[in-house]
Amino acid sequence: MPKVVVTGGSGMLGRWVVKHFVEKGYEVVNADVKHLAEPLCRSVIVDLNQLGEVYGVLAGADAVVHLAAIPVAYSHPNEVTFQNNVMSTYNVLEAAAGLGIRKAVIASSESSYGLVFARERIGPQYVPVDEAHPQVPQDSYGLSKIVNEQTADMIHRRTGMQVVSFRLGNVIAPDAYERFPSFVHDPEQRERILWSYIDTRDAAEACRLAVEAEGLGSVALNIAADDSSMAVPSRELMAARFPEVRDFRTALAGHESLLSNEKAKRLLNWQPKYAWRDHVKGWEK
């Protein structure tokens, strides 16, 4: 039975990742600052900023999925966010390399593109935003994610470890769909995330597929649903909120996501299964 350590497994996404790996027959260890609300697997309380503790919790693992982080900008002092997110990721990858672990998945973010937490509202250079889009954050959170992706590149160069960095869209647990009717008809809401989202169950499956994939090297992948989180068609969203953007790389038919997931689908053989439209009744009104 392969063993995977999930850091941040007690969190909103982490608990779904833990659940998915357990259901697929993996031995799972949750490494976090608190225990899981339901005992899906063994939990180890760990400070990821302490390299020795990280070595201890990763010992014997075949793979690590690193989700633990300060998850947004401006919730903590900027330097605290940067230090925590960068050092914890460095320690996880450094310890994994030292222990001979060959597979890692780390949580990056769509925030690295620079739109989400910009001081003044800015639009994308083109849509759908793919992994080649410039990353121009103005905040320590987005910058920390770029540094983490570069740490992944370095570890791969040095050791050959496969490290997949997920630039996650807005992560949505199933119980959050009840809030969607409050915003799906208002283009002004959620514009900074380009109206993207990803169901926790689809993100969890992507984590497993990345662990099971071979030959990816160090690669960053957008993880988003196929559709936007809005009832308004995607072209209308862009015309209403970002009329200055004229570079459309696809036809933007219907409600196509403005955060491209094509690379992840191709490399991981992954297909998002969960859409908010299947959970929310009467959204067309």
Language-model regions: role of each:
Residues 64, 76-105:
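NAD(P)-cofactor binding segment of oxidoreductase domains
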Residues 37, 46-84:
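NAD(P)H-binding glycine-rich loop region in Rossmannoid oxidoreductase-like domains
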Residues 91-138:
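Conserved Rossmann-fold NAD(P)-dependent oxidoreductase catalytic core, especially the SDR/UDP-sugar
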Residues 4-24:
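N-terminal Rossmann NAD(P)H-binding glycine-rich loop of SDR-like oxidoreductase domains
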Residues 201-285:
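C-terminal substrate-binding subdomain of Rossmann-fold SDR/epimerase-dehydratase oxidoreductases
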Residues 83, 119-159, 190:
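Catalytic helix-loop patch of NAD(P)-dependent Rossmann-fold dehydrogenases
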Residues 131-138, 165-198:
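A conserved pocket-lining segment of Rossmann-fold NAD(P)-dependent short-chain dehydrogenase/reductase
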Residues 158-162, 173-185, 209-220:
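Glycine/proline-rich active-site loop of Rossmann-fold NAD(P)-dependent oxidoreductases
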